[in-house]
């Protein structure tokens, strides 16, 4: 895999608060190699290492995108939801930003059935068929459609399990992470100082609580994916 330059700037990461970890009492000892200091009771992440692993992640997603691979971005906590949706839409990725439904990947046949139902209901709404049903039936189906839109709207065009999954918060998305591990799907995630860096294929040491940090990391990954997709379009 060819290494590329992704304009990862340490000062920019500091301004975004990427280096701020959790309180020193809430840390995972496995993160010791990625911590450079303690300041006012919190751990400080070594941004040089962050830059290294973020660059590796960008290389990986560029290479995958240039070969037409599919990505899923997962981040369901309120702070991350908008950034996840923005990043996914920009890079034409699938995303989950409301709630991870258990078995979404490991029980793909059930997810596929739900997606078929979702598409059918969307078509019925688009054609006006729902409005021609009795009010009670129409109301029930509209509630069902709204629920499916909330939880599956970001994966409505997904036709199979993704090739790479990007996860914003290890603890919040642990079920999604375990499903990826079970299926052998490569994962990239932000690794705060209270996380286990050994569970992902590429762990990016970074603050997974600050919106500015999440947005910066996703922005770099999304740029690499877009560049890779452009390469794929030029050289199919």
Swiss-Prot record:
GO terms for molecular function: structural constituent of ribosome. InterPro entries: Ribosomal_uS2 (IPR001865), Ribosomal_uS2_bac/mit/plastid (IPR005706), Ribosomal_uS2_CS (IPR018130), Ribosomal_uS2_flav_dom_sf (IPR023591). GO terms for cellular component: chloroplast; mitochondrial small ribosomal subunit. GO terms for biological process: translation. It is found in: Plastid, Chloroplast. Keywords: Chloroplast, Plastid, Ribonucleoprotein, Ribosomal protein. PANTHER family: 30S RIBOSOMAL PROTEIN S2 PROKARYOTIC AND ORGANELLAR (PTHR12534), SMALL RIBOSOMAL SUBUNIT PROTEIN US2M (PTHR12534:SF0). Belongs to the universal ribosomal protein uS2 family. This is Small ribosomal subunit protein uS2c. It comes from Nicotiana tomentosiformis.
């Amino acid at each position: 895999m060819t290494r590329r330059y992704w304009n990862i700037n340490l000062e920019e990461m500091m301004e975004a608060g990427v280096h701020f970890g959790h309180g020193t009492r809430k840390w995972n000892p496995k993160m010791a190699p990625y911590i450079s200091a303690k300041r006012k009771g919190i751990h400080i992440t070594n941004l040089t290492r962050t830059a290294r692993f973020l660059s590796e992640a960008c290389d990986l997603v560029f290479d995958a995108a240039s070969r037409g691979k599919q990505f899923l971005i997962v981040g369901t906590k309120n702070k991350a939801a908008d950034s996840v949706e923005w990043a996914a839409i920009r890079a034409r990725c699938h995303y989950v930003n409301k709630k991870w439904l258990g078995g979404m990947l490991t029980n793909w046949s059930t997810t596929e059935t739900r997606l078929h139902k979702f598409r059918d209901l969307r078509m019925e709404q688009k054609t006006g068929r729902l409005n021609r049903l009795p009010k009670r039936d129409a109301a029930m189906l509209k509630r069902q459609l709204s629920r499916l839109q909330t939880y599956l709207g970001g994966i409505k065009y997904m036709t199979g399990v993704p090739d790479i999954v990007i996860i914003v918060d290890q603890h919040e998305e642990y079920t999604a992470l375990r499903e990826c591990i079970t299926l052998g799907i490569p994962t990239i995630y932000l690794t705060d100082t209270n996380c286990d860096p050994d569970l992902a294929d590429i762990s990016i040491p970074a603050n997974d609580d600050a919106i500015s940090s999440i947005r910066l990391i996703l922005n770099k990954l999304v740029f690499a994916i877009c560049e890779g997709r452009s390469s794929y379009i030029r050289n199919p």
